[in-house]
Amino acid sequence: MTISPPEREGKVKVTVDNDPVPTSFEKWGQPGHFDRTLARGPKTTTWIWNLHANAHDFDSQTSDLEDVSRKIFSAHFGHLAVVFVWLSGMYFHGARFSNYEAWLADPTHIKPSAQVVWPIVGQGILNADVGGGFHGIQITSGFFYLWRASGFTNSYQLYCTAIGGLVMAALMLFAGWFHYHKRAPKLEWFQNVESMMNHHLAGLLGLGSLGWAGHQIHVSLPINKLLDAGVAPADIPLPHEFILDPSKMQELYPSFAKGILPFFTLNWGVYSDFLTFKGGLNPVTGGLWLSDTAHHHLAIAVLFIIAGHMYRTNWGIGHSMKQILEAHKGPFTGEGHKGLYEILTTSWHAQLAINLAMLGSLTIIVAHHMYAMPPYPYQAIDYATQLSLFTHHMWIGGFLIVGAGAHGAIFMVRDYKPSQNVDNLLDRVIRHRDAIISHLNWVCIFLGFHSFGLYVHNDTMRALGRPQDMFSDTAIQLQPIFAQWVQNIHTVAPGATAPNALAPASYAFGGDVVAVAGKVAMMPISLGTADFLVHHIHAFTIHVTVLILLKGVLFARSSRLIPDKGQLGFRFPCDGPGRGGTCQVSGWDHVFLGLFWMYNSLSIVIFHFSWKMQSDVWGSVLPDGTISHITGGNFAQSSITINGWLRDFLWAQAANVINSYGSALSAYGIMFLAGHFVFAFSLMFLFSGRGYWQELIESIVWAHNKLRVAPSIQPRALSIIQGRAVGVTHYLLGGIVTTWAFFLARTLSIQ
C-alpha cells in the first residue's frame, strides 16, 4: 500500500457544469440532429441506415471526450429505466395475469403461468391446463421461484413491487436528463478512478449485498421456513410483521432473542441458526439452503465494504491505481503496464472491452451455477426453466464476449496511440501478434481435425458394423480423467476443508441424489467418452471464435496486406476499388464472422447440456429408489457418432415441436417454422453481392419513372456492410427462435 503526504495530491472534488446543454424538444424531434449531414434530411435511402448506425456512435458526433463521457453516463440511466420498466412488467404480469398464489400453495403439482391468451381467432388452444383449474401459457423464466425465495406471498406485494419498478424507472429517466442537461459532471469526475472504485465496491456491491442479506434474513428466511413446513401462504405473517415484531422471529430463530450483543462480543456462532454453512440443497425445495445464501451475501458484503476502502482519495492513504499498474513489471514484460492507466481513463472503448469480456465470462459461469447449484425453491424440478435459463445465460455471455472483441478493435482504430505505448505489455502483444495468431490457428486446426476425426472414425466403424473398434465407454475408452479427478476432489475435499458442511457445494460433482416430488432435482453427473469427444468440439469452436475476434483486434490498425488499415476506420468493405482480395478485413468484419462462430460454439454447448441432462440427470425416482431418466441414459452410446446426434437428439427430440399442431404447444410449431424461414431469409443477404441488387433497383426505378410515380428519395441497394449486418442479424434471430421453439416444445411436453 502507498501512503502519501497530504500536500502532494489535490483534494477530490465533485465538479459539474450547470445547464451545459439546453433541453429542446424541437431539436430532438428533428431526425439526425446529432449529425450535420444527416440533419439535412434524406436524399437517398442510405440516410435511414446511417441514422441508425450513428445515433449511438457518440465518437462520430463529437471529439470532446467530456461530452462523450456525459452522453454515455446519461445513456446508462436510460438503460436502467428500460430495465426497470421491463422488470415492472414482469411483476405486473405476476400480479395480474398469473397463478402465482395457487402455485405457491402447491408448487409440485401446479405449473407456473403468467399469461392468458385471448381467443380472438381461436388462440385459446394455447392456454394449457397448468393445474389447479388455471388455463394459460406455461412460463419458463423462473420468476415464480425467485419470488418464492424473496418472500412474496400474495399478488398485492407483486403489484406494489411493479409500481416501485415504474417509480424507479421515472427516477432513472429524470437522473439521465438531469446529469446531462442541468448538472453535468466534468471530465475529471469520470476519470477519478479511485473514488469510482471505492463507491462501486463499497456502495453498489458491498451495501447492495448487505441490503439483500438483510432482506433475506428478516423477510425471506422466516417466510420460506414456514412455507417449507407446509403453512398456507395466507396464514404467514407479512414481511413488516417479522421486521417490527421480534417475537415472531424468535419463535423461528431463537438467537434473535439475544439481539446484537453476540455480534459485538464476537460470539458469532450464536447466529448459526440462520447463518449456516450446510452445503448441498434443501431436500424439501431442491434449492440452495436460504440460510446458506443469506450467509454468503453477508460475507460478500463484508468483503466488498472492506475492498471499497482500498483506494487513495482525500486522506493520503491507500492504493493509487496508476502506481499499481506502473509497478506491475515482470522479467519478460518490458515496461509492463505503463501507459495502461492513460488508456483506461481516456478510451471508454478499451474500458468497455475489458468489462464486456469479464461480464460475458461471468454470465457463462452463472449459466453453469444455475443448474449445478439451483438457487431458488422448486427451480431444479422445472426442467423447461432450467434449460431456458442455461441457454439464455450462455447466449447473453456469448454476445457480451463478441462485444468485447468489437470494442477492442474500435479502441485500436480510434483511441490507440503508438507513441504512448512503447515496449509496454500492449505494445509487446501487438508486436507478437503473428506468433499469437499463427499458434492459435495451429491449435484450431489440431482441435478441429482431431475432434471431428474421432466422430468420423466412430461413424465409419458403426456404419461397418464394428462397434468393438469405436471410441466408447464399452470399447476403446477415452475417459476424461482430469475432469473426473476434479469432480472427485470437489466431492471429497469438503470433508477436510469444511468438516461441518452437510454436503458438497454441488451434487454435480458427487454425493447423493436430491429428489423433490419424485423428480430428480440434482445428482452426480457422470462423465465418460461421449463427454470427452464433445468437449473437444467445444474446445475447437471456442478457439476458432477467439482466433477470429483476437485477429480482428490485433490487426485492426495494420496488417501486411493493408498497412494503413487504421486510416480506413473500424468498418469498411474492401481497400478501395482496383485492389482485389482485400475484402472482409475490417475490425467490423471480424465481429461479423465472430458472431457466426459464437453461435456455432454455443449451439453445441446447449445441445450437449440439453441431451446430457435428459439422459443422465433429469427424470423420475421410482418407489424402489431407482431412477428413470427421460431418455434412458442414451447419451453415452448415441452421442459418439454424428449420425447419433442427428437421429437421437435433433430428429427424435424435434418430434414434440413438429407434432405440436392442435395442442397447447402449437405456437412453438409455428415459431419453429418461422425461425427456419428467418434463418433462410438471412442467406439471401449473405450469399449475394451489392451490384446484383443495385441493378435490380435501377430496373424498378425505371418502371416507376415510366408510370410517373418516381420517389423523391433515391433508392439505393444496401452497402456491403449493411447487407452483412442484416444477414447476420436474421441468421442469429432465426437460429435463436428455432432453438427456443425446439427446446420448449420438447421440455414442456415431457415434464
Swiss-Prot record:
Q: Which Gene Ontology cellular-component terms appear in the entry?
A: photosystem I; plasma membrane-derived thylakoid membrane
Q: What class of enzyme is it?
A: oxidoreductase
According to the record, the signal peptide region is: none
Tell me where the transmembrane regions lie: 72-95, 158-181, 197-221, 293-311, 348-371, 387-413, 435-457, 532-550, 590-611, 665-687, 725-745
* Cross-referenced Gene3D superfamilies: Photosystem I PsaA/PsaB (1.20.1130.10)
Kindly list the biological process annotations in GO that this record carries. Answer: photosynthesis
One example GO MF annotation: oxidoreductase activity
Which is one Pfam family of this protein? PsaA_PsaB
**What is this enzyme's EC?**
1.97.1.12
Q: What's the catalysed reaction?
A: reduced [plastocyanin] + hnu + oxidized [2Fe-2S]-[ferredoxin] = oxidized [plastocyanin] + reduced [2Fe-2S]-[ferredoxin]
PROSITE patterns, per this entry? PHOTOSYSTEM_I_PSAAB
Quick one: which residues bind chlorophyll a? M684, Y692
Alphabetized InterPro entries for the sequence: PSI_PsaA, PSI_PsaA/B, PSI_PsaA/B_CS, PSI_PsaA/B_sf
- Family to which this protein belongs: Belongs to the PsaA/PsaB family.
Q: How does it assemble?
A: The PsaA/B heterodimer binds the P700 chlorophyll special pair and subsequent electron acceptors. PSI consists of a core antenna complex that captures photons, and an electron transfer chain that converts photonic excitation into a charge separation. The cyanobacterial PSI reaction center is composed of one copy each of PsaA,B,C,D,E,F,I,J,K,L,M and X, and forms trimeric complexes.
Q: What does this protein do?
A: PsaA and PsaB bind P700, the primary electron donor of photosystem I (PSI), as well as the electron acceptors A0, A1 and FX. PSI is a plastocyanin/cytochrome c6-ferredoxin oxidoreductase, converting photonic excitation into a charge separation, which transfers an electron from the donor P700 chlorophyll pair to the spectroscopically characterized acceptors A0, A1, FX, FA and FB in turn. Oxidized P700 is reduced on the lumenal side of the thylakoid membrane by plastocyanin or cytochrome c6.
Q: What PANTHER family does the annotation carry?
A: OUTER MEMBRANE PROTEIN, OMPA-RELATED, PHOTOSYSTEM I P700 CHLOROPHYLL A APOPROTEIN A1-RELATED
Q: What is this protein called?
A: Photosystem I P700 chlorophyll a apoprotein A1
